[in-house]
Amino acid sequence: MKFIITGGGTGGHIYPALAIASGLKERLGEAEILYVGTKKGLEANIVPRAGLRFTTIDISGIDRSSMLKASRSLVKFPRSFFQAWDIIKDFQPDIVIGTGGYVSFPIVMAGTFFPSKTVIHEQNAIPGLANRNLARRVDYALLNFAEAAPYMKAKSMKVTGLPVRSEIFNVQRAESIKKLGLEPNLFTLVVFGGSRGAMTINQAMLEAVERWQDSKMQIIWITGESSYNEIKQQLEERLSLSKRRFLQLYPYMFNIEEALAAADLAVCRAGAGTLSELAILGLPAILVPYPYAAENHQEKNARALLAKKAVEMVIDEFLDGDTLYKKVNELRENPVYLKEMARNMAKEGRPNALNEILDVILTLPDN
């Protein structure tokens, strides 16, 4: 069978797509898969590393900061749609699968005009405009949150959860601690801001990190590539070499599952992909929802877990070094509650999500 998979811009759209691709290959033995992304998205680096055939179309997300910028983004759509049309016409997939991000809209939309079956996966409790529109045309809409269903006027729909990478299931805590050169008996904090980093989290960390240098804890801090050099320079100026040993600084981690498995607590955004991986590993978190996410979906994702006592939450505009320092220390000093959070987070994991998604995808040609 032949599949086109599309999803990009951020890791939250890419990694579920890679999980589906890997699952299809495992189920079918042989599957011809073409991944469609953009040259500027993270997928251009991540997907080829996964060994998948990769091609691109020319499209960018809608910039809502002004009508002029939004108009410029929309002008590109006809071109990207016809690029998508040509790709589908040439490749002739049996099924087109979209996992979100602006690149998936023209690909899946074009797919609905061909004999190919089409399926989308919506990750968030509040669907974006693209998937709301696609839902009316595709053969199947798969959901991570049941709360998304009222927004999706799809022919067929199912709540499956979000597929996570196979590495998440295979990673071991003790082995990860050893690989990363961490001390096995120290409290470990992992801090990251999504695949592109997060300015607010990075700034709060810069304000707080010196206060942790003499404490019995270790930190894995993934800054995002754009902020890495500046943060590294500041730390070198403010912390002596001996004091920096408690801190591991990375611009990006392709093996982030090892950092998550090694950690006792995470500080991060509240994207659906991130939350699904944390849930599988039972890793509690202090969530700082991205304030400009469409429909404010990250805060809604975070509040759902906050109500279940699986996470703590700090609104982005209220996060600073002092708040972060106090939040982390409160949880460090209350291991009983931290373990309760971990148990509650693990209850939210849906380890069978990928199999449910594959079952739907592979029965589509028969319908």
UniProtKB/Swiss-Prot annotation:
GO terms for molecular function: UDP-N-acetyl-D-glucosamine:N-acetylmuramoyl-L-alanyl-D-glutamyl-meso-2,6-diaminopimelyl-D-alanyl-D-alanine-diphosphoundecaprenol 4-beta-N-acetylglucosaminlytransferase activity; undecaprenyldiphospho-muramoylpentapeptide beta-N-acetylglucosaminyltransferase activity. Its EC number is 2.4.1.227. One of its GO terms (cellular component) is plasma membrane. It is a peripheral membrane protein. Gene3D superfamilies: Glycogen Phosphorylase B (3.40.50.2000). Pathway: Cell wall biogenesis; peptidoglycan biosynthesis. It is found in: Cell membrane. It comes from the Bacteria. The keyword Lipid biosynthesis does not apply. Keywords: Cell cycle, Cell division, Cell membrane, Cell shape, Cell wall biogenesis/degradation, Glycosyltransferase, Membrane, Peptidoglycan synthesis, Transferase. One of its GO terms (biological process) is carbohydrate metabolic process. The keyword rRNA-binding does not apply. UDP-N-acetyl-alpha-D-glucosamine binds at residues 10-12, 124, 165, 195, 298. CDD domains: GT28_MurG. It is an enzyme of class 2 (transferase). It catalyses: di-trans,octa-cis-undecaprenyl diphospho-N-acetyl-alpha-D-muramoyl-L-alanyl-D-glutamyl-meso-2,6-diaminopimeloyl-D-alanyl-D-alanine + UDP-N-acetyl-alpha-D-glucosamine = di-trans,octa-cis-undecaprenyl diphospho-[N-acetyl-alpha-D-glucosaminyl-(1->4)]-N-acetyl-alpha-D-muramoyl-L-alanyl-D-glutamyl-meso-2,6-diaminopimeloyl-D-alanyl-D-alanine + UDP + H(+). Pfam families: Glyco_tran_28_C, Glyco_transf_28. Belongs to the glycosyltransferase 28 family. MurG subfamily. NCBIfam families: murG. Cell wall formation. Catalyzes the transfer of a GlcNAc subunit on undecaprenyl-pyrophosphoryl-MurNAc-pentapeptide (lipid intermediate I) to form undecaprenyl-pyrophosphoryl-MurNAc-(pentapeptide)GlcNAc (lipid intermediate II). HAMAP family: MurG (MF_00033). This is UDP-N-acetylglucosamine--N-acetylmuramyl-(pentapeptide) pyrophosphoryl-undecaprenol N-acetylglucosamine transferase. The lineage of its organism: Bacteria, Bacillati, Bacillota, Clostridia, Eubacteriales.
